[in-house]
Amino acid sequence: MTASDIQPTEPHTPPTPHADTRLVDRTKLSKMYQHYVEVKDKYPHALLLYRVGDFFETFFQDAVTVARELELVLTSKHGGEVGRVAMTGVPHHAWERYTTQLVEKGYAVVICDQVEDASEAVGLVRREVTRILTPGTLLEEGMLKSSRNNYLAAVVITSNHWGLAYADISTGEFLTTQDSDLERLTQELMRLQPSEVLVPTNAPDLGTLLRPGETSPHLPECLPPSFCYSLRSQQPFSQAEARSTLLQRFKVRSLEGLGCDHLPLAVRAAGGLLEYVEDTQKAGQVSLQRLRTYTITDYLIVDNQTRRNLEITQTVRDGTFHGSLLWALDKTSTAMGSRALRRWLLQPLLDIKGISSRQDTIQELVTNTRLRQDLRHLLRQIYDLERLTGRASSGTANARDLVALADSLSRLPELANLVIDAHSPFLKALQKVPPILEELAQKIHAHLVESPPLHLKEGGLIRPGVNPLLDERKATVEADHQWIANLEVDERARTGIPLLKVGFNETFGYYISISRAKADQVPANYIRKQTLKNEERYITPELKEREARILTARDDLHKLEYEVFVTLREEVGEQAEAIRHLSRAVAAADVLCGLAELAVYQGYCRPEMVNGREIAIIDGRHPVVEQSLPAGFFVPNSTQLGSNEETHQLPDLIILTGPNASGKSCYLRQVGLIQLMAQIGSFVPAKSARLGICDRIFTRVGAVDDLATGQSTFMVEMNETANILNHATSRSLVLLDEIGRGTATFDGLSIAWAVAEYIATEIRSRTIFATHYHELNELAGMLPNVANYQVTVKELPDQIIFLHQVQPGGADKSYGIEAGRLAGLPTVVIQRAKQVMGQIEKHSKIAMGLQNLD
């Protein structure tokens, strides 16, 4: 036979592991995999993590997804008669880290944990779903941002009305509202930035979690695409079932006390949301605060465009916290205070009484330096009471959480003593510490060791003297450990091997370790168990017999410790409402204390809030830009707006002109931010301020193409302008920058003129209109409630100096060519631009046309 007679054979390759449960004969799966598939069938749109020993494993198609998203190795396991199935897994002690990544990517994750000891199981270890994690239902500290709420929202929409409910299950906050304006629904969602929005539907793919940008024909068109939506069954959102859910949860006979009895859509949204929360939190009931009802128009409305343009929570350029208004104002000492400040900024007040109450507190803290400093010192020692309580009430808190909670509760009596002579209701609220919370803190400290381990079922949690039976078991375990120590000493003496050691690991249990060089001295009764590079490991019958007793005693001890801890945790959960009530008081005091600190060090004034339309700011400053510059570098400017019977001489509309890069946009934002700060109760960056309440702040500052909807820069600008003209009132503040610049000069000027004229004559909102159309200065001579202001410059023979000062009068130049020169345009381009500008100015017909306007 020659080599050419030999037929080549295919190389052996193992069969591809199964990755699709639909293609598998389930009767041929082993029992564990059959159970896995049964659980998976109940949650087809979630990723299932299934506890197997020390790992959470996932199989079939979920294994492929998890391996891809987490960049893990995709492997396989024997699944019974079907052969191998796709598998990947993560260590059980690190499940939070991996699950966080999956949830951040928009996945729902189901945790199926072992609920009995594997050593005691008869047959298959019993497993149950203990948690369903979705973007809006997170509780774990490592999964949440401490400085902001993690909202779950639910919406119910009919032809002419909508209901909205939202909750942060980590803090217990739970609110609902109802309205008829769909634009307000969009703005509320943009304000809340919920991590997940529940939408009732008859869709066949119920349970689907739509990640941001994903669409579904079952999703109402009015909902913005930037959120994660969960399609839910309509049944929990029905009027009858939602009402029943709320009545049962809050143990009331009527919804009247919750303020939503007359709001059917608000009830449906709240009931559906509550049912979803209870369904996802399998291990324990989340403690939500009593449902509160609110009305959107009870607060200053700040739409998404204004939040963006004023950079309230993040910058426009790169979306960062640093450089935002929140960054400039946040001098809080606690996570609760930081979240509260964010909420205040996104929902300013309209009520002068409420604003004044906050101002009074700041005034008291500004005046009383010692109180402010001592208060801030104590607040820094308080942990996140809201979220610690949330984890305790839901059964997810560990021992370190309870110790942190007790440490914080122990500080509350000190806070109460500190504010004993305070006058402000916000500070007096800190005096009301229920004795039961002091007792609870003492009990936690008496039960738990000072620095408990992270894991609850490995012992070392409970102090001696707490439980007699526990002390007995500890003594037994300690005696066993002493027996092991004595064995090591005795065996060293008996064998003559001085480096003999008795060790332990979870795989082999107890063993005797001897270096390989001393192997010839090993006694005959030693049984070799393992050979390593430099040592041999042995066991003896006596050691293995004792090991069984030791491990049983250890496990009994750990179980009892865990039971004692769970009882203590449940006691904490029973006081959740009392703790949260105090935590809200701490958060408010923290915000006001931080604002007082800011007022002192930045030289802020207390604004006078009035019911009229006046906006009178003397030497105002931009709160963010000022902090970004060296002290004293910011140029302050005043603002006078808002005519009424008392201030009829003040204009309703200011035409603001001036050079490029002179500070017009900064001035616009400055006025808006000062008004916003005043309406959250803060002091403001100015020498003095007298401010009428605004019902809404509108801004139109800058524009970019909206590629998602195919809108040009100019069309975006026109849409935003139309929104302002259709919704602004005489009590609104409107800040407009460069209306009409996105089209031809004549078109742009005409639109800008008409918009300014309409606002001044029809709406009469307080408005600053920044423009390079100097022709708009003519409006001041035609309309009595319009005034011209300019940002001044100093002209030198070869350059201009920006003075950044806003003064009465209209500018007649934009100095755009000079700005181009400063930016580095070639000299030849600058010279040519001057020639062209001279010709255009000589032959312009715009001025002549304006003279003929009616």
Swiss-Prot record:
Chain intervals for the UniProt region annotation (Disordered): 1-21
Transmembrane segments: none
The keyword Signal is assigned to this record: no
UniProt binding sites for ATP: G658, P659, N660, A661, S662, G663, K664, S665
UniProt source species: Trichormus variabilis (strain ATCC 29413 / PCC 7937) (Anabaena variabilis)
Gene that this sequence comes from: mutS
Leader sequence residues: none
Lineage: Bacteria, Bacillati, Cyanobacteriota, Cyanophyceae, Nostocales
A molecular-function term among this protein's GO annotations: ATP-dependent DNA damage sensor activity
Protein name: DNA mismatch repair protein MutS
One Pfam family from the record: MutS_V
